[in-house]
Amino acid sequence: MSTAALVEGKIVQCIGAVIDVEFPRDSMPKIYDALILDGSELTLEVQQQLGDGVVRTICLGASDGLRRGLTVKNTAKPISVPVGKPTLGRIMDVLGRPIDEAGPIESDVTRSIHQKAPAFDELSPSTELLETGIKVIDLICPFAKGGKVGLFGGAGVGKTVNMMELINNIAKEHGGYSVFAGVGERTREGNDFYHEMKDSNVLDKVALVYGQMNEPPGNRLRVALTGLTMAEHFRDEGLDVLFFVDNIYRFTLAGTEVSALLGRMPSAVGYQPTLAEEMGKLQERITSTKKGSITSVQAVYVPADDLTDPSPATTFGHLDATVVLSRDIASLGIYPAVDPLDSTSRQIDPNVIGEEHYSITRRVQQTLQRYKELRDIIAILGMDELSPEDKLSVARARKIQRFLSQPFHVAEVFTGSPGKYVPLKETIRGFKMIVDGECDHLPEQAFYMVGTIDEAFEKAKKIQ
């Protein structure tokens, strides 16, 4: 469509990131149409039609300097972003424009960021396991290839570090394409991630889309859809894609920021009334079809460590595996701080993971649960008052707890200890030996921050 044919309107009101634009009554823009400010690259997205030719829009960029009377043009189509191989190795913003100063993106194919979720008969569920090399995840909450995983945790318990380690272990081993959407997170983390990918020579297989903390709410609200659109394109070409989102909570928060300005009545805890619908629209598109798969890992910030908060609670229902990071475990110095009693996976089924893996997982959880029940008694009366069986359970549980810790590759520069990738077979063998009592003679500190069980035996020799 030539620029001459674009219908023009005028800005009539600006309130923060929400802009009202008046158009001729016979040519009002549709919902989700992209409008462009005349003489600049600023894009507005239509959210509501208020009547009398006025539409209410969200500004995808800084609204500084906007005033009433400025001319806006209707592109008559939703926001479209470049997709395909030219996006790999590049950093883009919410509109698919490059922000890495490496020249334009030479892509002939663009795709609207608003797509329908695949039809029911196109879906292709999978039970194939995806090995991560992280003991606690592979044992307690294994991931399915083409599944959805959430990393839940409060501030500072290690969501981003866990996400980086998963990217390091899966994306490098995976060999396929990955898409990373940085939604409302720190710019520093985006920069670190870019250099991490560059140094490990996998940047040419990753598309990066950033809408960071310092950007207006419109950008943060839509950047997850931009990243997802790129991942969907690779999936529809028959590829297996990894899709990483950090952080889903900021996507919700951006919606909350603009919801009140759009004139909606807030619902529980001040969230937007459309929270479940917005989350559903995003999550239902992150799925595997008969053409290809999207395996997604999403970090989810938990406000005030409250998992019943509407935002994380709405996210739970969409996931195949939930990895819950606990402040209590982090305070013991055990990293990754995954709570083995709170984390779950739909793959924990003897028909999927096998009888041995299933029984070891359940025995590990039973031992830890027993220790949790006895902790109050130990705190009041001490260990001496416990029965011999309970003393043994506590000793094994403390060893399991320490053996669930593991040095990460991405944390090597901070900790000084080299990262460990532990194959699933080794993980199962190690925990089987602990619950079977084959390690009862070893000191518990031998299990802290090691990879396989053999390393624990070696460490015990050094300690003794």
From Swiss-Prot:
NCBIfam families: atpD. Its EC number is 7.1.2.2. One of its GO terms (molecular function) is proton-transporting ATP synthase activity, rotational mechanism. InterPro entries: AAA+_ATPase, ATP-synt_VA_C, ATP_synth_F1_bsu, ATPase_a/bsu_AS, ATPase_alpha/beta_chains, ATPase_F1/V1/A1_a/bsu_N, ATPase_F1/V1/A1_a/bsu_N_sf, ATPase_F1/V1/A1_a/bsu_nucl-bd. F-type ATPases have 2 components, CF(1) - the catalytic core - and CF(0) - the membrane proton channel. CF(1) has five subunits: alpha(3), beta(3), gamma(1), delta(1), epsilon(1). CF(0) has three main subunits: a(1), b(2) and c(9-12). The alpha and beta chains form an alternating ring which encloses part of the gamma chain. CF(1) is attached to CF(0) by a central stalk formed by the gamma and epsilon chains, while a peripheral stalk is formed by the delta and b chains. It is found in: Cell inner membrane. The keyword Ion transport applies. This is ATP synthase subunit beta. Belongs to the ATPase alpha/beta chains family. The keyword Membrane applies. It comes from the Bacteria. It is a peripheral membrane protein. One of its GO terms (cellular component) is plasma membrane. SMART domains: AAA. Keywords: ATP synthesis, ATP-binding, Cell inner membrane, Cell membrane, CF(1), Hydrogen ion transport, Ion transport, Membrane, Nucleotide-binding, Translocase, Transport. It catalyses: ATP + H2O + 4 H(+)(in) = ADP + phosphate + 5 H(+)(out). It comes from Burkholderia cenocepacia (strain HI2424). Produces ATP from ADP in the presence of a proton gradient across the membrane. The catalytic sites are hosted primarily by the beta subunits. Its main location: membrane. ATP binds at G153, G154, A155, G156, V157, G158, K159, T160.
